[in-house]
Amino acid sequence: MVRHTAGHLVALNWTMKNVFNVDPGDVFWAASDVGWVVGHSYICYGPLLHGNTTVVFEGKPIGTPDAGTFWRVIEEHKVHSFFTAPTAFRAGQRADPKGEVAEKNDTSLLEQASQAGARAG
């Protein structure tokens, strides 16, 4: 795969503000695999280019060890915006259908949750 560096970097910087709604200094988390293009683009390059702290997470965010992993990471690292696949949201809903686990964490700083990569329905 060949990436034209300048255009790719300009697009990543633009999407950090205009898609993920983060300002320099905000904490951003892309719960993706760094081996995928979206992973290294939004775990590494985009946030660092835009002046954001990025959360690097190892493991599955749902089911390991429990459905609260997503929300604990968001609370612990004061995540402002995060991005994941619809599959992760669905797994969270199956594991915690009433949102009881999610409510145990302070996610008041989380302003945006985005999803892409598979159909949401």
Indicate where each model-derived feature is located.
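RNase H-like, metal-dependent nuclease domains and their acidic two-metal-ion catalytic environment used
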Residues: 36
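Conserved short alpha-helical elements in the N-terminal third of ANL/AMP-binding
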Residues: 39-55
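Conserved AMP-binding A3 loop
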Residues: 1-10
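Short, well-ordered alpha-helical scaffold segments within catalytic/effector domains
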Residues: 9-13, 41, 67, 89-90
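Active-site beta-alpha turn of Rossmann-fold NAD(P)-dependent dehydrogenases/reductases
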Residues: 32
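Conserved adenylate-forming
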Residues: 24-25, 50-53, 58-121
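Glycine-rich helix-loop-beta junction characteristic of Rossmann-like nucleotide cofactor-binding loops
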Residues: 18-22
